[in-house]
């Protein structure tokens, strides 16, 4: 293959994994929840074979499937963006990244206060939209930073743009990133700027400061082989800027799709790795199945035109990184789910590979298809689909 587009529909899981009970996610199924919405319309992907995936018995089967299909089970101990993307890129994480259900300890907060010169508000798990509603006015009065976390391995800093300009907030995040290492090496430090008057609203100028992957990823291998590795959306931040030759941020799914389409019209040799974040950020965590379904339709409607631009030696792999069931009311966090692997292209054989153990099979497959040497626990399915 000359070009592979790897598109992550962030949080679009396809049903609980066998160990879902250990994560508090029994019964979760993101795609099924969206399929029950009156806004759901994925006619193109259904015609390619979406309903033929293992466990997706609530969607019609394709008359003549066009895609190579697999349901992938996570091997890593986690259900967050970082762990999921790392595994897609070839790394299995035996231990989950640290989480803070009781807030961050003083040995983290003390140096953070000293180095930023600002106090800290909240310091506990919180919804991102609720935390600015509940602490925003106190933040405006005091200038103290709103620090909070979630069920994921994250240290989030919210600040009003009139009090803390974005670049200063990013500097505070860099300070936190240096403090949060070793036993407190959280997956991501996230800048969460907000604006307006109470109840306030978050801006799209969020920025993630990720911990570096602990081993080489397939991204590193692609760059080492002298090929292109293009990151679209938050891929740059998830991998801490490592293993890429070019990157572009996006303001949301619509922008991400437009930028991905533009890369389809450009010459390159290697991988274009795309994250579409709105599914997770705007609809999954906010438990909005209709919004999620509309976003899935937007992607589905975009896909045929994109496929028409692919050449003989091109392929697209559509997948996810975890679940975030928009109807799951026991919590508002990610859900431990299988993910889809849907491969399309002129050379792709329509074959169903069933259920496979490991998101890392994608990394092994990408490496083989691009003829890039890379060692991963994953098993390539390249020879089965082309």
List the predicted regions and their residue ranges:
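Feature captures the catalytic ectodomains and active-site-proximal regions of enzymes
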Residues: 1-386
């Amino acid at each position: 293959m000359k070009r592979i587009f790897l598109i992550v529909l962030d949080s679009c899981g396809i049903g609980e994994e066998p160990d879902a009970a250990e994560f508090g996610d029994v019964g979760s199924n993101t795609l099924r929840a969206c399929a029950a919405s009156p806004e759901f319309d994925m006619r193109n992907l259904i015609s390619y074979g979406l309903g033929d995936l293992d466990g997706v018995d609530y969607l019609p089967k394709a008359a003549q499937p066009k895609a190579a299909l697999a349901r992938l089970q996570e091997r890593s101990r986690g259900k967050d963006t970082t762990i999921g993307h790392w595994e897609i890129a070839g790394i299995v994480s035996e231990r989950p990244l640290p989480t803070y259900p009781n807030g961050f300890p003083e040995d983290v907060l003390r140096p953070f206060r000293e180095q930023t010169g600002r106090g800290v508000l909240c310091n506990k798990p919180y919804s991102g939209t609720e935390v600015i509603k509940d602490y925003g006015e106190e933040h405006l009065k005091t200038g103290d930073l709103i620090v909070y976390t979630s069920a994921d391995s994250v240290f989030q800093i919210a600040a009003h743009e009139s009090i803390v300009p974005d670049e200063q907030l990013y500097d505070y995040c860099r300070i936190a990133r240096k403090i949060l290492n070793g036993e407190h090496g959280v997956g991501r430090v996230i800048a969460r700027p907000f604006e307006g008057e109470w109840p306030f609203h978050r801006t799209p100028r969020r920025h993630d400061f990720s911990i570096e992957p602990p081993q080489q990823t397939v991204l590193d291998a692609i760059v080492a082989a002298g090929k292109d590795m293009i990151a679209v959306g938050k891929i740059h931040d998830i991998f801490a800027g490592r293993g890429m030759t070019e990157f572009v941020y996006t303001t949301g799914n619509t922008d991400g799709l437009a930028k991905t389409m533009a890369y389809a019209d450009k010459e390159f040799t290697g991988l274009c790795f795309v994250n579409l974040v709105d599914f997770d950020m705007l609809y999954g965590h906010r438990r909005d199945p209709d919004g999620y379904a509309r976003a899935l339709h937007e992607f589905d409607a975009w896909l045929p035109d994109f496929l028409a631009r692919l050449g003989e030696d091109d392929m697209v792999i559509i997948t996810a990184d975890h679940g975030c069931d928009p109807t799951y009311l026991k919590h508002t966090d990610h859900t431990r789910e299988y993910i889809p692997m849907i491969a399309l292209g002129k050379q792709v054989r329509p074959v169903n590979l069933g259920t496979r153990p490991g998101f890392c099979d994608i990394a092994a497959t990408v490496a083989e298809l691009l003829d890039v040497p890379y060692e991963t626990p994953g098993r390539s399915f390249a020879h089965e689909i082309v």
